[in-house]
Amino acid sequence: MGIFCSVIKFENLQDLRRLCHWGPIIALGVIAICSTMAMIDSVLWYWPLHTTGGSVNFIMLINWTVMILYNYFNAMFAGPGFVPRGWKPEKSQDSMYLQYCKVCQAYKAPRSHHCRKCNRCVMKMDHHCPWINNCCGHQNHASFTLFLLLAPLGCTHAAFIFVMTMYTQLYNRLSFGWNTVKIDMSAARRDPPPIVPFGLAAFAATLFALGLALGTTIAVGMLFFIQIKIILRNKTSIESWIEEKAKDRIQYYQLDEVFIFPYDMGSKWKNFKQVFTWSGVPEGDGLEWPIREGCDQYSLTIEQLKQKADKRVRSVRYKVIEDYNGACCPLNRGVRTFFTSPCTEEPRIRLQKGEFILATRGLRYWLYGDKILDDSFIEGTSRVRGWFPRNCVEKCPCDGDSDPAPEGEKKNR
């Protein structure tokens, strides 16, 4: 549904710099190795083209490669869709329900979030994917999910070719002795013999490609099921986190209210159709969304504003007592700090003795917060935020006994 309906816009191809990143280089390398080796193994050593089955098999391999690459590049270059710079709601009074992004100089539309990597506010942002070096969001969610489906299917087909090639080529070449196993790599397995013999180099290349194909099938297949779960609930991973924090906030303050997620249409099929359409274009403009009964366009954004206000209330001021160079895993801060470094792409921030930090959340040995640079921090115009070790700072006496609890303990408070 919609696999070939959406078209990569030509003007977006100017951004070829997205290919110059370790994610696309590895992803395209794996696709190239698996598809090329599968075709070579099929034609030369397993299923020759002069047979009907061999021709059908070869066409299927080409088809997998084309569909995988199409959806991959569509997800990369079409992009997730960005909130227009300077955007604001049609009704000026509605701006009170929205957060303002000072980087984009625009209000954050419902379901949009600012991506530090893309440096833009992304429509219905799910996450920034390093493998496509772009965000997964409103406009490319379908292509991204189809890529996650087609890649494991194509790799499963390729893995079958690799296994059968090695089996058919080695079956008559093994000789077992009392203490040894010998392989005669010069023995021919096909009649007529292949143009290129299946030697040690071909065996090693096929075995390597098999490992890549199986690894891709498992890893990317798991990502596909995660995305399908997100689509059927019509709830991105970020929105799942917001909903979890909403329940935590209500429980923490023992409030008499219930948070209802506004974008779950109550039917998996209806949620599915929000992303996958026959035209290949997702439903909606990325700024306004269909909502369930009893909610409005700003139900989620109002909850986000409540959480932001709550975060300010629960934040704790710290003073830096030891320098920190911003290393991801600083061994000089202790073994426990080294091995419990947060597994996230969020940055670490350099600290100098005497600076002040406003911490908003934390782990057992790490804290996350904003460096208080000057008075402009209060206005939100200047922010340097990230993770830093707990043992580099001490709590300011004016903040009493409050302390950002480790994230795993928040629900027990």
Curated annotation (Swiss-Prot):
Q: What does this protein do?
A: Endoplasmic reticulum palmitoyl acyltransferase that mediates palmitoylation of proteins such as AMFR, CALX, ITPR1 and TFRC. Palmitoylates calnexin (CALX), which is required for its association with the ribosome-translocon complex and efficient folding of glycosylated proteins. Mediates palmitoylation of AMFR, promoting AMFR distribution to the peripheral endoplasmic reticulum. Together with SELENOK, palmitoylates ITPR1 in immune cells, leading to regulate ITPR1 stability and function.
Which residue ranges does UniProt annotate as crossing the membrane?
A: 25-45, 58-78, 144-164, 195-215
Give the matching Pfam families. Answer: DHHC, SH3_2
Which Gene Ontology molecular-function terms are recorded?
Answer: palmitoyltransferase activity; protein-cysteine S-palmitoyltransferase activity; protein-cysteine S-stearoyltransferase activity
Where a lipid (S-palmitoyl cysteine) is covalently attached, the residues are 328-329, 343
Report keywords, A-Z. Acyltransferase, Endoplasmic reticulum, Lipoprotein, Membrane, Palmitate, SH3 domain, Transferase, Transmembrane, Transmembrane helix
Q: What class of enzyme is it?
A: transferase
Q: How does it assemble?
A: Homooligomerizes. Interacts with SELENOK.
Coiled coil location: none
Name recorded for this polypeptide:
Palmitoyltransferase ZDHHC6
Q: Which residues form the active site?
A: 129
Read off the domain note.
Answer: The DHHC domain is required for palmitoyltransferase activity. The C-terminal di-lysine motif confers endoplasmic reticulum localization.
Membrane topology term: Multi-pass membrane protein
Q: Where is this motif: Di-lysine motif?
A: 410-413
Describe how it is modified after translation. Answer: Palmitoylated at 3 different sites by ZDHHC16. The combination of the different palmitoylation events strongly affects the quaternary assembly of ZDHHC6, its localization, stability and function. Palmitoylation at Cys-328 accelerates the turnover of ZDHHC6. Depalmitoylated by LYPLA2.
Q: Which residues form the DHHC domain?
A: 99-149
Q: Which family does it belong to?
A: Belongs to the DHHC palmitoyltransferase family.
Question: Where in the cell?
Answer: Endoplasmic reticulum membrane
